[in-house]
Amino acid sequence: MKKVLLCLFCMMFFLQGCGKDHEGEPIELTPQEVLVRLQDPKKNSFMLYITSDNCYSCDEYEKVIQEIEEKTPFEIYYLKMDTNEEDTDIKQAVEELQITTGKIQSLPSTFYFYQGSLLPENSKEGYLEKKDLLK
């Protein structure tokens, strides 16, 4: 009986970890983590937005993202980019990311990957209102 209860208790914790990791908030990724996510064989759908610390529009956009996060069936990730980045590994990862997303012209930029693929109509640049994000 003790073994059964112990197994049930362990299963409960295991299954609890199967839900969204960060309920109600986007998950920050490094450029390298974004590349890993893009190469994920599961081909999950997710949204990625790119932002910066010194960007008023980005700060306001994060509030909009937090409003819609609970209403989305997919994970939302974000990448904070420093335009003056000097780390060569990060620069290389950002360049590789831009092969998939295209050149990032302005911040914030939003990309919706449907089953691992990015369609041109799923790339948006600049601040978006809540209604535009949920289309």
Regions picked out by a protein language model, each given a short descriptive name:
Residues 1-4:
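Positively charged n-region of N-terminal signal peptides that target proteins for export
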Residues 19-21:
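Bacterial signal peptide processing site
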Residues 36-74:
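Local sequence-structure signature of Cys/Sec-based thiol-disulfide redox active-site neighborhoods
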Residues 53-56, 82-86, 117-119:
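Solvent-exposed loop/turn segments at secondary-structure junctions
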Residues 103-135:
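Non-catalytic, surface beta->alpha helical segment in thiol-disulfide oxidoreductase systems
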